[in-house]
């Protein structure tokens, strides 16, 4: 088999590998949402669930955190995406008033 034919056959594999690699780079580029961000402040977001004001958010429970919220898109990672904060990551151990138990 010629080198050219071998090269042409490998293009789809290289393209797929490149796409997967680029997806990882794009994912890693998301900044963390700041607690002072207007959307975060409106939802009472805290990067550490233990720092939530119980008087202000009486429905908050110590075992509630972004990592076990239905909206969290980070799996078991220390930070991950949340549709409420487009383009920004939240802390796995964070919390906001939109917390909803994972099914």
From Swiss-Prot:
Q: What does this protein do?
A: Specific class of high-redox-potential 4Fe-4S ferredoxins. Functions in anaerobic electron transport in most purple and in some other photosynthetic bacteria and in at least one genus (Paracoccus) of halophilic, denitrifying bacteria.
The protein's UniProt keywords, in alphabetical order, are: 4Fe-4S, Electron transport, Iron, Iron-sulfur, Metal-binding, Periplasm, Signal, Transport
In its UniProt entry, the species of origin is given as Ralstonia nicotianae (strain ATCC BAA-1114 / GMI1000) (Ralstonia solanacearum)
NAD found in the keyword field: no
Pfam families in alphabetical order: HIPIP
* Secretion signal span: 1-28
GO molecular-function terms, A-Z: 4 iron, 4 sulfur cluster binding; electron transfer activity; metal ion binding
Q: Which family does it belong to?
A: Belongs to the high-potential iron-sulfur protein (HiPIP) family.
Tell me the residue numbers annotated for binding [4Fe-4S] cluster.
66, 69, 82, 96
SUPFAM superfamilies assigned to the protein according to its UniProt record, in alphabetical order: HIPIP (high potential iron protein) (SSF57652)
**Where is the protein situated, by its record's location annotation?**
Periplasm
The keyword Protease belongs to this UniProt entry's keyword annotation = no
Please give a single GO biological process term from the UniProt record. aerobic electron transport chain
Please state what the protein is called. Answer: High-potential iron-sulfur protein
Q: What are the annotated GO cellular component locations?
A: periplasmic space
Query: Could you give the subunit structure recorded for this chain?
Result: Homodimer.
């Amino acid at each position: 088999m010629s080198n050219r034919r071998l090269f042409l056959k490998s293009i789809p594999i290289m393209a797929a590998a490149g796409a997967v690699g680029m997806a990882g780079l794009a994912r890693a580029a998301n900044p963390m949402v700041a607690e002072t961000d207007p959307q975060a402040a409106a939802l009472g977001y805290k990067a550490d669930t233990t720092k939530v004001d119980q008087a202000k958010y009486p429905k908050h429970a110590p075992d509630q955190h972004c990592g076990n919220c239905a909206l969290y898109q980070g799996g078991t990672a220390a930070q991950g995406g949340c549709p409420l904060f487009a383009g920004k990551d939240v802390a796995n151990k964070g919390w906001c008033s939109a917390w909803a138990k994972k099914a």
